[in-house]
Design a protein with these regions (language model features):
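Mature, function-bearing regions of proteins
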Residues: 1-278
Length: 278
């Protein structure tokens, strides 16, 4: 059965966070994410391993964890959200496959700061990415739609800009915008790269955040390598990186404590702004 999962893979590597203003702060850690083909997950295909769909699996896929609260099947929920964030429905007509780069339940616990839904056309070109962002402890979700520009170079410059409309960190306000760069999962590449940059908006006049206009305040970079979606690979992963969800949650609060100690300006909860269609 493992051979049937032609589009699902394990990705393992490193994520780094760097803060540049008002004080420098950085960290990096090892992590894994699963690139799951939506059709294969809806068909409940997987090798016999610690990953599966039952309560006893150490790593468990629950369809309800993604685009939570939306009606219909997972694939249709993704399509509906993409259409809602687009200025037309034509884009989804060209989507033949969706790969979701996500965390799954680990020992029954689920939290994922960001899930990425890569949409591919019939020629296996990734055309757009739906990004599902979650915050803690509020457990809210917000969605960004990022078009992917096709190019054949290795330029790591950010390729798309969206306004920041969702409160994630109490150490950054909402008067910012994101710059995104994706090198998506591809059948002809073993590498995956995602970078998100936070830049101040040009009209940022907040006295507690005196960054220069459009200055880069923060970036997060994830560099991952593809591994086979097999029972052996899952056991190796578990031995090296157990309890991934707990590691993520503890890491968020540990780094927040460090920022408090550094006296980084603190912003109370900020109400999310609606995302406008492209």
């Amino acid at each position: 059965l493992a051979e049937q999962l032609s589009h699902s893979h394990i990705y393992r590597g490193e994520i780094s966070h760097r803060r540049f203003h008002p004080k420098a702060h950085s960290f990096a850690y090892q992590l894994f994410m699963l690139a799951l083909d939506v059709d294969e997950m809806e068909a409940k295909q997987c090798p016999k391993s610690i990953f599966g769909f039952s309560w006893f699996n150490l790593l468990r896929f629950e369809e309800k964890d993604y685009l939570k609260g939306e009606p219909e099947s997972l694939k249709q929920r993704i399509k509906n959200k993409v259409i809602a964030l687009s200025d037309c429905e034509d884009g989804m007509a060209e989507v033949s496959r969706i790969t979701m780069l996500v965390q799954v339940r680990c020992l029954g616990l689920y939290f994922s700061p960001a899930n990425f839904y890569f949409c591919y056309d019939a020629n296996e070109n990734c055309t757009q990415v739906l990004v599902e962002v979650s915050n803690t402890p509020w457990n809210e979700r917000h969605y960004y739609l990022v078009p992917i520009e096709q190019n054949n170079n290795d330029d790591n410059s950010a390729t798309h800009v969206t306004n920041k409309n969702f409160h994630v960190s109490p150490f950054m306000n909402l008067n910012m915008h994101y710059q995104w760069l994706f090198k998506p999962p591809m059948s002809n590449s073993d590498k995956l790269f995602i970078r998100i940059e936070n830049h101040c908006n040009g009209d940022n006049k907040d006295d507690d955040n005196k960054a220069d206009n459009k200055q880069k305040v923060f970036d997060a970079t994830m560099t991952l390598s593809k591994k086979p979606f097999t029972s052996k690979a899952f056991w190796q992963l578990w031995c090296n990186l157990p309890a991934m969800t707990l590691k993520i949650l503890l890491g968020i609060y540990w780094q927040a404590l460090k920022l408090l100690i550094k006296r980084i300006p603190f912003f109370g909860y900020q109400k999310s702004q609606p995302t406008e269609p492209k």
